[in-house]
Amino acid sequence: MALWGVSDADESKPKWLSDTDKSNTFASAAGWVLRKTVGSRTLEEVLVAAQGLATGIGVADITAIDWVSTTFDRSAGGTLSATVSYNEAVTVSGTPTLSVTNGNQGSGSGRGPHVLTYASGSTTNQLTFTLAIGAANAATNANDVLSFGANAVAHAGGSTIVDTVGGGTATITSAAGIGTAAGTITVVA
């Protein structure tokens, strides 16, 4: 088996990368690229040159959904933030959304799902989605468990997510396992 390849499978990324580096690696017209942030600078390095890789692998696919925030305090309020990673750079138009399931484990019911809106990341392989929730807001209760399910990304209000190279419509469907891998956030009082 090769260490890398030209296919739309996430497994085609260079094998020696750490899990974090795999999330920051994407296909480009030049090959597999690793994006790192060093201080205030964002650096990109071509790890494996494979001319035309981004067009050869087809449409962009979701490879991971991860929480940026790892906790949420209902009494203080704050911003829920998550990143959706693609296997190649995508361009966003409009305001797509990301749905978060609230298991309503806290007292009461009827909270959620929560809808995070697109905040940043167009022309990269990582899109950030956010939702501000005020202090003591009824949207969450202590002990609620927030998670991602299958097909959490949606094209709200005519928004689009397309391949930056090639322009094909990026996949917005994802298996439940991708959301499950992100883990959960348990709301504290």
Spans of features found by a protein language model:
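Non-catalytic beta-sheet/beta-sandwich ligand-binding modules that flank or precede catalytic cores
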Residues: 1-189
